[in-house]
Amino acid sequence: VLCCEGNGGYPEIGTPWVPLERGYSVLGWNHPGFGESTGLPFPEKEQNAVEACFLFAVHRLHFQPSQIFVLGWSIGGYTASWIAMNYPDIAGLSKKLSVFSNYFKNEVLDATFDNIDELSRRVAPSIFDPVLESVVKMYLDLNNLSHVINYDGPVLIIRRSDDEVISTGDDHSRATNRGNHLLIGLLKHRYVKAYNSCSIK
């Protein structure tokens, strides 16, 4: 299991413990600039870092891609979904595995978002929206939905209640959770006929 941490996590104390306790081999890594890692955590650097770990698992540890699950938590969903999109023969993708080892047969998305645009608007007054939009598109275009719709494996989406990080409302309600948009975007892509024949809200 290749583990991709969230913004506040480290592989020494974070997501690797869940698959490790269930008997899986685990490979964890730090975001560039986190822990003992050098660099800056921009999208291209993040992609390079996770790809280096994935290729290490394949070429040095001799795992087949079909034996590798990728686990991403929160913002780690970006790198996890990027690997799934670029290496679709992986065994599965997980975004924040909780206590569900049986779901390692699926792509599991937990505590993540569709893209970072709306979330970035939460942190600044609306007068800065044009600047934020430009900066996000240019430097921090974390679009998980664009990755997930380019991965054809099975997907299980887990949405947390009262998630203050990926909700856009002040009350952190499930209705404003950006995981909803990830699910709807995926359904629109995979089930076009069903989506056109009924309303998904």
PLM regions: where:
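The feature captures the conserved acid-bearing segment of alpha/beta-hydrolase catalytic domains
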Residues: D117-N196
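Short hydrophobic segments within beta-strands
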Residues: C3-C4, L71, I158
